[in-house]
């Protein structure tokens, strides 16, 4: 089973339609929630993925806490991949310091790619400086 926690209003019907179109609706569940306070016990999931969500979470001003909350629900040995505006110091502070904190908290394998927009992963035609800048990719195994 796959679960998706959606923080934005609307869109749930579209998610369900896409799942049906891909033939996976019997394996996925979508629910409204708050990424700052996930309604799941510790170590519930084998994997967690987030793409440009954390900086949008209004219920937690400290975006590092949103990352920690996402990691809380990942099982020991589980994988994660988070892409967000990690290079924006006003949101995440110093990433070297944050990565150290995550390692000290027990994250076993931790990788970070700063400025993803400069790595050639994002097609140039969708790169708008006001939209796709300061992007970092944080991934690994808990």
Show the residue positions of the predicted features:
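A short SAM/SAH-binding and catalytic strip from SAM-dependent methyltransferases
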Residues: 46-61
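Class I SAM-dependent methyltransferase SAM/SAH-binding core
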Residues: 1-37
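Short "lid" loop at the C-terminus of a central beta-strand within the Rossmann-like core
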Residues: 2-5, 54, 85-89
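A short acidic, Gly/Pro-enriched loop at the edge of an enzyme's catalytic core
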Residues: 36-48
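Conserved class I S-adenosyl-L-methionine
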Residues: 81-101
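Core SAM-dependent methyltransferase catalytic element
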Residues: 105-106, 119-142
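Helix-to-beta-strand junctions that scaffold the AdoMet/dcAdoMet cofactor pocket
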Residues: 24, 57-58, 74-76
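A short glycine-rich, Lys/Arg-flanked "PGG" loop and its adjoining helix->strand segment in the class I
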Residues: 63-76
């Amino acid at each position: 089973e796959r679960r998706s926690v959606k923080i934005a209003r609307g869109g749930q019907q579209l998610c369900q339609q896409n799942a049906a179109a891909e033939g996976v609706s019997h394996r996925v569940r979508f629910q409204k929630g708050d990424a700052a306070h996930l309604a799941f016990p510790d170590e519930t999931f084998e994997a967690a993925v987030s793409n440009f969500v954390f900086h949008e979470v209004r219920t937690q001003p400290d975006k590092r806490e949103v990352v920690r909350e996402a990691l809380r629900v990942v099982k020991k040995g589980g994988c994660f991949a988070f892409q967000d505006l990690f290079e924006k110091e006003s949101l995440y502070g110093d990433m070297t310091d944050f990565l150290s904190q995550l390692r000290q908290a027990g994250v076993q394998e931790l990788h970070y790619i700063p400025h993803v927009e400069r790595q050639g992963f994002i097609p140039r035609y969708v790169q708008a400086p006001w939209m796709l800048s300061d992007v970092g990719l944080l991934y690994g195994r808990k």
